[in-house]
A protein has these predicted regions:
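Generic structural signal for well-ordered beta-strand positions
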Residues: 52-53, 79
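C-terminal tail/sorting-segment detector
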Residues: 2-4, 59-62, 77-103
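Residues that cap or initiate secondary-structure elements
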Residues: 25, 36-38, 61, 73-75, ...
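Glycine-centered coil/turn sites that cap beta-strands in beta-rich domains
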Residues: 1-20, 24-45, 54, 69
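Intrinsic-disorder/low-complexity, polar/charged segments enriched in Ser/Thr/Lys/Arg/Asp/Glu/Gln
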Residues: 27-29, 39, 64-66, 83, ...
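Signal that preferentially marks extracellular ectodomain short beta-strand elements
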Residues: 67-79
């Protein structure tokens, strides 16, 4: 690890990786690393900004974590094929990624 890497980590709360597989059916995994413990909100939205699913919400320890989306909405109903946004928020930092569900 270089000094630049260490400085970047000091200013970051987390690193969010691309989901895998993508496109996916029936489920996908999204990996993220928290550089320090804290509250996490991890949600899935459709392209109109409507909440589809809550993947994780609550206090998490520093380290690597996995969130799994099974392609279902908050009511347990399978979401239709399409592009969805996953958004991780923690410690004042927020990042969004895109994923494609194919039915």
């Amino acid at each position: 690890m270089t000094e630049e890497d260490t400085a970047a980590e000091a200013s970051q709360v987390f690193t969010l990786l691309q989901n895998s597989p993508n496109p996916f059916n029936p489920s996908t995994v999204i990996v993220y690393k928290l550089y320090r413990s804290g509250f996490v909100s991890f949600r899935v939205y459709d392209l109109l900004g409507r909440l589809v699913s809550v993947l994780d919400e609550g206090e998490k320890n520093a380290g690597w974590h996995e969130a799994v989306w099974d392609g279902r909405n908050t009511s347990g109903i399978p979401a239709p094929s399409g592009v969805y946004l996953y958004r991780l928020e923690s410690g004042g930092q927020a990042e969004t990624g895109k994923m494609t569900l194919l039915r």
